[in-house]
Curated annotation (Swiss-Prot):
This is Tan_12Cys. It is found in: Secreted. Residues 22-28 form a propeptide. GO terms for molecular function: toxin activity. The cysteine framework is C-CC-CC-C-C-C-C-C-C-C. Contains 6 disulfide bonds. It comes from Terebra anilis.
Amino acid sequence: MNLKVLFLLAMVLVTLCLGEDRVTDRRKFCKCCASCCVSGRNIDGDCPPHGNQQFCHFCNREKVKIKRDCRSNQTAYQHCMEYHIQCASVKNHVCTDQ
């Protein structure tokens, strides 16, 4: 009986720790994307010609939402992922220290 309780407690702790890591990573990533939106306006890099402008246009409308609640803003996170895939070299250049 004690082993079952210990096992369940261990599983809960592991789940909480992994969940917090995901939230932290996501928060950092959203912060990075918001920064890229501001800093990336004049950076062409390896982006497609329209990639940066599209993201910045989205960010201008959603910037407050991204910064305020990136954990639950699925649309912002999705756009961040698209931006990350399209403009990885620019993102890494702008956001290496964040």
